[in-house]
Amino acid sequence: MTDTTGFALEAAAVGKRFGRRRGSGGWALRDCGFRLPAGRVCAVVGPNGAGKSTLLALAAGLLVPTEGRVTVLGTDPASARARVGFVAQDKPLYPHLTVAETLRMGADLNPRRWDAPTAERIVADGDLGPKTRIRALSGGQRTRVALALALAKRPELLLLDEPMADLDPLARHELMGVLMAQAAQYGTTIVMSSHVVAELEGSCDHLLLIGGGRVRLAGEIDELLEAHVRVSGLAQTSLAPHTVVESRTTGRQLSALIRPAGPLPEGLRTSAPSLEELVLSYLRNPQAPGTTPAEAASESEKATL
Amino acid sequence: MSALRVPGLPRTVLRLHRPALIVWGAFVAALIGWLVWLNTVTSSAGERERAYCDHHETCNILDQLNYGQRTVWVATLVCYSSLAVAAWAGASLIGRELESGTAQLAWTQGVSPARWLAAKLAVPALLTTLGCTALVLAYRRAWSAHPGLRDGDWTSVTTFVARGPATVAYALCALALGALTALLLRRTLPALGVSLAATWALHFALERFREHLWPSVTRVTATEDVWPRHVWQLESGTIEHGHRVAHAGGSPCEGNPAQVKQCADKLDITGYYQVYHPRSHYWPLHLVESGIVLAVAALATVLAFRLLPRRTRAARKESLA
């Protein structure tokens, strides 16, 4: 399943500008660089309008980067089309087709790759009648059909834009299980965006944090968590030379999230941050230095060795 | 459909546009049915009237008029069926897909956008060609069945198109123009409107310039003569001082032959001329027009395919600094 480079998705200095306006306006994504090793389940998190959907659409070959290059499964996104699954945020489906016709369309458009039993099982688990028209389905039911379409083509890379947004907790849990089973069984690389971090914790092993159109943080979640420490101590404690992501002083008490550059000063209480704390700290502090794309790339390389 | 073993992509196009296919099939069948009705029931009543009129001073021509008029209606529907194709192609075939994002659904299956557009154009083109060919053949048969009851000659605007392959050419061109406008505008309703307007404008322009599409015939006579039968009359007039002078409202000299001669001498009229297309020019005129329309269709198709990568394409071949 893995290609020669070992990366499912690579972005090199990718920028995408909408509209022809010059100046700062119009850039949805700027100077975006990262490498995602094959076989990972990657969470793309960031606030609304951060560029998550743009990034996924670039990877799916639906948008052309204004600058830089996107590499998917070792080739360009257009050539990788047959091996990539994509579920857009608004789950576009043909409203006048029935569920069964939609799946038959998937079989017709993905000759040789189509896994009909998988598609039928996912749909049947949601109690969807094959004769039901798509326009009669609820948002969550449409999501299920869209996921069935994307999974049954047996993609090597599965791109999901806010996949779980309109699912009830039960369906969310079940479909996440289906996704993880797929990833485990076929080594599928999954990239899913969300602005709900809790949704991704526990199922993802790689993180891509996007804010303001740039990559703020990229790497294995375990390594990212290990690289950061939550500290608390007296307010006058100097945190230099460590990288401070976020610090807050209440009275004489200091609490901060830092990326240690060496041994920590005496007298600080330390604890491990949760993924949500880490993400929120970066999002609350847009000026906090993130890991640079080069660092992220070298981290990813280390991870693949 | 499955019995025919249509390959996957065309089958999907057929499945997606089944309602349009049914409407188009019903339209073709209804028009052919109407022509059959006109040429069995209405025409026999008209012919009976005509036979009666041949031997009586006063007679009723209502059935004859009905037959002629309704045949013209059919010609109008056949000729302008391309407008319906244009509206559908702009709105339903491509425009709605781009607006609602379902085109992207297709492009993220194992189908490249170029193959998608090719199938989206080829399948409707085939069915449009079949339908229009059936309509043209039926109309030609009906038009020549009862010449005595006809309303209008081969030159009438809609009959001219409906009797030949220009009908097919206009429909194919409408399909291509619809796809092009939809790719340009990416919205259902604007694409519908612009596609319809562009197709209508093409009809309008070619109707205006039709007479110039093939060299006309000029006949010069010493005395004023009536027009030859079944010709497309373009211009007539007199030759005065060796120059042609067009007379739209009839001859400048009227009266008995002696009076006309006297008048002509006074005005120094040396002859009369008529400019027209004989009936034998129908096919040259018709085929040139069809060729122009097909050229526009080809141009629109090429532009649509060249525009498509700007709507969706990955990895521009750019070197990275």
What are these regions (language model features)?
Chain A
Residues 60:
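Helix-to-loop junction immediately C-terminal to a conserved catalytic motif
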Residues 158-162, 167:
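Catalytic Walker B motif of ABC-type/P-loop ATPase nucleotide-binding domains
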Residues 173-258:
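ABC transporter nucleotide-binding domain
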Residues 45-47:
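The feature captures the beta-strand-to-loop junction immediately N-terminal to the Walker
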Residues 9, 29-31:
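Conserved structural motif at the start of ABC-family nucleotide-binding domains
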Residues 67-80:
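Conserved ABC transporter NBD signature motif
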Residues 90-145:
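ABC-family P-loop ATPase nucleotide-binding domains
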